[in-house]
Amino acid sequence: MISQIIPFFEQSPWAFYSYITIIGLLVGSFLNVVIYRLPIMMQREWRGDCLEFLKQPAEKAEDKLNLWLPRSRCGECGHQITALENIPIISYLFLRGKCSSCNTHIAIQYPLVELFTGIISFIVAWHFGVSLQTLFALILSWSLIAASGIDIGHKLLPDDLTLPLLWLGILLSFFDIFINLESSVIGAMAGYMSLWSVYIVFKIITGKEGMGHGDFKLLAVLGAWVGWKLLFVIILTSSLVGATIGITMILLKKTSRGTQIPFGPYLAAAGWLSLLYGEQLNRFYFSFL
């Protein structure tokens, strides 16, 4: 069956782009679940580990929660979301952004994540075409969206996302899917050490922690996928965009100077751009030197 589908998509690229976009919309719906539930699951695990370490009695068993069960419910009235109410974007528009049971407003985040994931998936398919690169670039893209969403909401980049991506990037380099093994391994080490070094120097000078350890791991992930040569592009792009947005928010009084701003989404965006357009960005930056 696959041997028939691939030639069809190669001959009908827009059918392929449309198919991947629809898959992206569906995955976006699942990413909303990941963004919401994974931090809760981690918090429960940490609390349980702390109680065990302190030799304290375990807390009362909570309802089982993972990425699959229980089915999504309205946080206000407990109404279980039906399949028809869970169609990406369409259900939100049909319900006019409200719960069908209690009319509580549904957060705009949900359709936005679905739409954004669909758009990103389309761009990846359009850029790489019918290839293994598309498959793995989609996995990275979707994971970066989930990680960014969690970082924005909780200032946390879960190891459950970053570490599997790190090893997957290195594994793919054995087969030269994006880069070779040498570039991947050096990229991972250099990515981690570069931000770790900045963190240490900043802490020595100011006595404060300027960024989280998850940022080191995320840059290591990106280095493993795009190679050490594009780390400069990722760091420069993420820093410029992050500084611009941060300064703008301060000027507009949307935040204060002491407010922590998650850096993960900027790293993720710069890394994603580097995966697709790294060489072009490299040439653009070095044209100013």
List the predicted regions and their residue ranges.
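Short, strongly hydrophobic alpha-helical membrane anchors
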Residues: M1-P13, F284-L289
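Interfacial loop-to-transmembrane junctions
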Residues: H213-K217, I247-L273
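C-terminal ends of transmembrane helices
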Residues: N32-R37, R96-T104, L144-H154, S197-E209, ...
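Membrane-proximal soluble regions of multi-pass membrane proteins
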Residues: R37-Q109
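Alpha-helical membrane-inserting segments
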Residues: L31, I35, I120, V124, ...
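Functional transmembrane core segments of multi-pass inner-membrane proteins
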Residues: I20, Q133-V241, F284-L289
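N-terminal signal-anchor transmembrane alpha helix
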Residues: A15-M41
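Select subsegments of transmembrane alpha-helices in polytopic membrane proteins
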Residues: A107-L115, D159
